[in-house]
A protein has these predicted regions:
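Extended hydrophobic secondary-structure segments that form protein cores and membrane-embedded regions
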Residues: 1-4, 67-74, 137-140
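Short beta->alpha linker loops
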Residues: 45, 141-144, 165
């Protein structure tokens, strides 16, 4: 499943789950349709994207479950605590997101607790993340909150985007993940 976040009126969209390896080409086609637009107005909505991914309806069957979230961002994230201020600012600029997820964590610590399995839910929604099969892969800069997440959260790998110089570097990382997971 691919959640996608943008600024402005169309803040959120998501794909269906892709079953690997059977739907590999469908996933590739979907990824080719995603584009980056605008930018330069850090921070962005990366934490919301991560929270939505964590609330996905992950498969619960099978002996070896892997619930893998891969997040790409080139910017710091808005703190959850700034939500009210940000929505008021967006309204002043004439933006009213047509789709914005409900029940976001109240702060970063609530998100951390759900990831670590210390609580079954945030905002009264149950997560189906497998406590031993969850994996978080971050392609993110050395900015809030990504640098800390790479250290603080279990089963998490972070790659600094400034160290990635080409598509070949990402392909190498993905090949490593494919064999490691």
């Amino acid at each position: 499943k691919i959640p996608i976040y943008y600024d402005g009126n169309h803040a959120y969209n998501e794909s269906k789950f892709f079953t690997m390896p059977n739907e590999k080409m469908d996933l590739k086609e979907y990824l080719n349709e995603i584009y980056a637009d605008g930018g330069g107005d850090d921070p962005e909505s990366g934490l919301e994207a991560l929270a939505m991914a964590m609330k996905s309806d992950f498969v619960q069957k099978g002996e070896k479950k892997r619930h893998i979230i891969i997040l790409f961002t080139d910017a710091a994230a808005h703190p959850f605590e700034d939500y009210d201020k940000l929505t008021a600012e967006a309204a002043r600029k004439g933006y009213k997101p047509t789709i914005y997820p409900e029940n976001m964590p109240k702060d970063i610590y609530e998100l951390y607790n759900v990831w670590e399995g210390n609580t079954e839910d945030f905002s009264k929604e149950v997560t189906t993340l497998d406590k031993t099969g969850r994996r978080l892969v971050l392609f993110a800069p050395n900015e809030y909150p990504w640098a800390d997440m790479g250290i603080d959260l279990s089963s998490t790998i972070r790659y600094d985007l400034s160290a990635i110089k080409s598509v070949d570097d990402i392909a190498e990382v993905m090949e490593f993940l494919y064999h490691a997971i």
